[in-house]
Amino acid sequence: MSIAVFDSGVGGISVLKSLVEVMPNEDFIYYGDSANAPYGTKTLEQVRALTCEHAKELILNQHAKGLVVACNTATSAAVRILREQYPDVPIVGIEPAVKPAMLFMENPRVLVMATPMTIREEKLKKLMDRYRHL
């Protein structure tokens, strides 16, 4: 069984590269949905549908033992739903590095570059609110 890495395009290849370096004895499947990229300009419902469809394929049909959602937009839109749908499968999402930026800087001012959909969603707002006081 493999660990699946999913992104809306090819950006997640850098995540896959790091995973291979850290876990060289694991098998990996990479799926980049270039046909539907970019996800950031789509509606929440569209991103959820695409992400859930690809996760289903990777987990149920490709028998992935874990899933890395290597896309901020897909993470923001669907990672909670995926964790509910597949409680026995470890699912890891990628989020903007707000926490490390806030923790490791004195008097932090952080610029977050993200897709329009990621900016609109509650997940990023909650993350920023959680670390705003630091």
Place the predicted regions along the sequence by residue:
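Non-catalytic structural scaffold of enzyme domains
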Residues: M1-L134
